[in-house]
């Protein structure tokens, strides 16, 4: 997910993407804890996606 793509979305869509990403992170953490997760890189990718979404939301709040 690229920041440029996120900047084109409205606030409602960003909130939806954020909720989906947080749910996915929650599920990945459980899989990791029970040794069912094969691709551990996905954990960092989802965390970075969440950070990108929050950054874009903050930019919109500040009117940048």
From Swiss-Prot:
One of its GO terms (biological process) is translation. HAMAP family: Ribosomal_uL29. The keyword Protease does not apply. This is Large ribosomal subunit protein uL29. GO terms for molecular function: structural constituent of ribosome. Keywords: Ribonucleoprotein, Ribosomal protein. Belongs to the universal ribosomal protein uL29 family. It comes from the Bacteria. It comes from Maridesulfovibrio salexigens (strain ATCC 14822 / DSM 2638 / NCIMB 8403 / VKM B-1763) (Desulfovibrio salexigens). The keyword Ribosomal protein applies. Pfam families: Ribosomal_L29 (PF00831). GO terms for cellular component: cytosolic large ribosomal subunit.
């Amino acid at each position: 997910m690229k920041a440029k793509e996120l900047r084109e979305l409205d606030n409602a869509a960003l909130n939806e993407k954020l909720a989906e990403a947080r749910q996915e992170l929650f599920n990945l953490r459980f899989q990791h804890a029970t040794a069912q997760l094969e691709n551990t890189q996905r954990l960092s990718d989802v965390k970075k996606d969440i950070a990108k979404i929050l950054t874009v939301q903050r930019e919109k709040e500040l009117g940048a």
